[in-house]
Amino acid sequence: MTVIDFTAEVEKRKEDLLADLFSLLEINSERDDSKADAEHPFGPGPVKALEKFLEIADRDGYPTKNVDNYAGHFEFGEGEEVLGIFAHMDVVPAGSGWDTDPYTPTIKDGRLYARGASDDKGPTTACYYGLKIIKELGLPTSKKVRFIVGTDEESGWADMDYYFEHVGLAKPDFGFSPDAEFPIINGEKGNITEYLHFAGENTGAARLHSFTGGLRENMVPESATAVVSGDLVDLQAKLDAFVAEHKLRGEIQEDAGKYKVTIIGKSAHGAMPASGVNGATYLALFLSQFDFAGPAKDYLDIAGKILLNDHEGENLKVAHVDEKMGALSMNAGVFRFDEASADNTIALNFRYPKGTSPEQIQSILENLPVASVSLSEHGHTPHYVPMEDSLVQTLLNVYEKQTGLKGHEQVIGGGTFGRLLERGVAYGAMFPDSIDTMHQANEFIALDDLFRAAAIYAEAIYELIK
């Protein structure tokens, strides 16, 4: 029996892997609804990245299919059983605070910096090369692989909804998504966004004209800006003291009797809100000391006094812990207030374990001083694949063999395409000692981790389909 050195096989293909990855990272594939149309369902960027990925697969001799620019796939091998690999080409907005251009991939000190380097273009390319090694070595296989790539994973997953409705194929029998971390993610909490609604009236000595913070529900807002006027005694001095006390950055700009106040924190993945510093909730806390009234006061009080650092929903009274899946988490992700609007919102993204539900959370939130509470159209229920499943066991065995580290199950708050299948998990590409920069400025993947992951993917895929 021939022993295959998958690490050596990756080494032979490192330059090609990086070249393909660079071609994907150079594409700004943020969702842009302002440019969406029938040909570009989520804007032109995600389509361009999808087309580039399928072009790479075409080049390497795989049969490919583009499903109306929502998603695409290529297939490898033959067999009745199908292994699904689910990845995505869309990225969250780059935001601010980068030391390099987020769409000019840059290698520095053994790290590859770019938006999408770790979520998810880097892991996708590593996994692609894992399968490519199997193909190029001509290894015997007994199952088919369908490698599916989406374009809306970071938003509502409308890409996968459309794909499965229109592709004309049954779902794969089992599979994984290279969109999280090793050793494995075999459980994922439920995911729902709930919106707090407020009127726009101002009746106090201080006036809130607007309040804006956050880019996506699944990102911790790095910064927020409010435009205010009225009785704001010692505004600059109070801001200076506030940002010094809380180790933040802030600034005030005056224009025609109005003050534009900005506070800057730190972005993070919305599934791990404690890893960030929510600039919006801190701005609301700062402003709440002034004499606002009516819905504007309610907006600032809830944002600054209840939502601030309420990562597990204790202040909101929605906290819940499951023995296996852990605690509920809450990210206050998007803030929009305009005094001229009758409907102003705060978007709260919950990652919830078994034992609670979106409706239960909603009923509790309705006790707040808000006009109403609504649910997002798209959500996901909790998902779990038992440790005893052969898929989980195979993936853990390969991880242990290649790293020398003990494998174990994990449940996360993040949502991945792995949950699209009843027997679906997430697998890599972050290692336990990796620095997680997903959804943050200066996102990167360590090159050593990228190549290690490719070798693990190669052996894991082979073990699943041989």
For every predicted segment, state its role.
Residues 54, 125-132, 161-164, 197, ...:
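Predominant activation on well-ordered alpha-helical scaffold segments within soluble catalytic domains
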Residues 63-67, 251-255, 332, 375, ...:
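Short beta-strand
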Residues 120-201, 240, 310-324:
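Acidic/histidine-rich catalytic neighborhood of metal-dependent amide-processing enzymes
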Residues 2-115, 136-141, 263:
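Acidic/His- and Gly-rich active-site-bordering loop/insert found
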Residues 271-342, 351-366, 372-466:
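An extended, acidic, His-containing surface patch that forms the Zn2+-binding/catalytic region
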